[in-house]
Amino acid sequence: LGLIDYKKCWDYQEELFAEILAIKSANRKENKTESTKNHLILCEHLHVYTLGKSGDKKNLLVNENYLKSRGATFHKINRGGDITYHGPGQIVGYPILDLDNFFTDIHKYLRFLEEAVILTLKEYGLDSERSPGETGVWFDVGTPKREKSVH
């Protein structure tokens, strides 16, 4: 999608997710087997901070007015995680999948996704790894700069 406003991209993700749910619901009601589509959105965002449902707004070290003055936006989202930053130059991937087509163990899914990212980065000569106790793919594990991560 290129460089896109976070809210616009979020709305698009919600639309794709709703389509998957509608197909699954119709399949159950009408005893059909129409397959659901899987999507991978790749994009960049303007400066944005998100707060996941397991996060704490106290972890945002500046107020929203400061963010606005810097051209950044802030969004509370219904996904896991804490405070996450996205911005220009950072490629973000959003898989919108029906996990029933794969496996329903979210932790297994996340480990497979991390491994796919690690192997893809390796193809481009970039070394990355998991960080114990954290979800995501990281460059320079142990470095305090979270900007060096892939979530």
PLM segments and residue spans:
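N-terminal lobe of the biotin/lipoate ligase/transferase fold
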Residues: L1-R146
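Catalytic cores of processing enzymes, dominated by hydrolases/peptidases
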Residues: E147-H151
